UniProtKB/Swiss-Prot annotation:
Annotated residues for binding of substrate: 10, 32, 59-68, 122, 184, 193, 213-214
GO molecular function: orotidine-5'-phosphate decarboxylase activity
EC number, as in UniProt: 4.1.1.23
Name of protein: Orotidine 5'-phosphate decarboxylase
GO biological process: 'de novo' pyrimidine nucleobase biosynthetic process; 'de novo' UMP biosynthetic process
Amino acid sequence: MSQSLIVALDFPGKQDVEQFLRHFEGEELFVKVGMELFYKEGPAIITYLKEKGHKIFLDLKLHDIPNTVKSAMRSLASLDVDMVNVHAAGGNSMMKAAIEGLEEGKQEGKERPICIAVTQLTSTSEAMMKKEIGIEKTLEEAVAHYAKLTKESGLDGVVCSTLEVPKLREVCGDGFVTVTPGIRLASDDVNDQVRVATPKRARELGSSYIVVGRSITKAENPLEAYKTVKQQWEGVTV
């Protein structure tokens, strides 16, 4: 189950990544590369991480017209990443185009990357969604609507908070992938995320993958923090 624990490499550049990964010699991680790191280092950071044996969730949250997203996904698939994402708000045609691009760009003999859609960011509260984004549904209703649209479009799952996982299991079935950021150890600050949970709670609620950043990357001993998160996520008593 450790391969369903994704470590967010929220660093400004490769040097910081190299320093962090020194704590994990011999470990094969599933890591998340976001906008900050990818926009600074480009595809070279993907090559570097792949050479180290790590799986990669390339978290760029694409949201554009269908043809642009299709072309972008064709390029991303050629990098041999393991997971990519789009914004569900881009709609059915855009999400279908994303899958078409991934199929066209995947490396020969390999499966296309897992493709998931962002429903609502974990920094979004219901009040913000209604007042600023203009969606009058409850947060749970909005997330469920986007999840159904995502499944109908042929994607593998969604990014959502742990709080929405049980509802999405009802709406989309057990095979639908739920990737949940906003994971913190009980002793950590929540920082800028609103809908957060512990690894243990994420497991209880049925998350497929959890994404953990600062609880590991900012820890005094990142490897020990990783092991603690992993134990809680896997339900191991020590």
